[in-house]
Amino acid sequence: MAVPAKKRKMNFSEREVEIIVEELELKKHLLVNHFNAGVPLAAKSAAWHGILRRVNAVATCRRELPEVKKKWSDLKTEVRRKVAQVRAAVEGGEAPGPTEDDGAGGPGTGSGSGGSGTAIAPVLLTPMQQRICNLLGEATIISLPSTTEIHPVALGSTATTAAATVTLTQIPTETTYHTLEEGVVEYCTAEAPPPLPTEAPVEMIAQPPDTSVKPQALKSRIALNSAKLIQEQRVTNLHIKEIAQHLEQQNGLLQMIRRSQEVQACAQERQAQAMEGTQAALSVLIQVLRPMIKDFRRYLQNNTPNPAPASAPGPVAQNGQPDSIIQ
């Protein structure tokens, strides 16, 4: 008997992926590795089941929890691979190369102080990948588009032994920078202006520049450093929030201690007032009882009978018998 083929489920839609990323952004303190220190497994499992319910609410076919976790793992792997390509290109001093998903590969022209070469299309992240990158805490670089040109200004070669000829690189004056999301830096450039005239050579006394570093690599390094600084600032802000929460807890404890001390002080005041009232009542009672005690003593003294005097004994005979008997 032939085994029936297993029906393959449809791929995750954009809406499902958006829900997964949105829920993970809301529950990052439970599910993201560098946020969920000390979170119990039961809380993590409940959070994943909540994400699964939201995904199944919009999905065309029923999803299982391992499928959702596998999709999130694939999204993280793809974003980390692109960021690794950018870092490798920055460390190697070359522009980031194209990827299979970008579809932006193509030849270009570029120039550097060390020689001539071909510029490769930069690695670009989609807005969803940028959100995932920020969620993972990776330093993101969005390189300049391939249409941006760098205009070198050739200076005169006449110089003395103490002077060095400096090649100036013109950056478009209308370049602006803005932040898409926290930790993501994007470069937006307008049309490149025409190159400066090269008629008048300029001589400057300076140290010979490092010709091995390309301008594009310098820009990429600056962007990487800025992204790292932003990430460090985010971590610092988290520490500051934790310290603030700790201080708030301590303030709450201090307020509770103060309230208990106030309650104890009120109780002591009430006890002191009660003691004073008792003492006043006793003093009044003593003052009332004193005349009564005096009157009672007088009464006892007046009503007590005086004892009768003892009778004188009769004459006793010499032999010890009374005289009446003798007579």
UniProtKB/Swiss-Prot annotation:
InterPro entries assigned to the protein according to its UniProt record, in alphabetical order: Myb_DNA-bind_5 (IPR028002)
Chain positions covered by the region annotation Disordered: 87-118, 301-327
Q: Name one GO biological process term.
A: negative regulation of cell growth
Q: Which domain of life is it from?
A: Eukaryota
Q: Which residues form a coiled coil?
A: none
The record's annotation in Pfam families points to: Myb_DNA-bind_5 (PF13873)
Transport is among the record's keywords: no
- Role played: Induces apoptosis.
The name this protein carries in UniProt is: Nuclear apoptosis-inducing factor 1
What's the source species for this entry? Mus musculus
Gene name, please?
Naif1
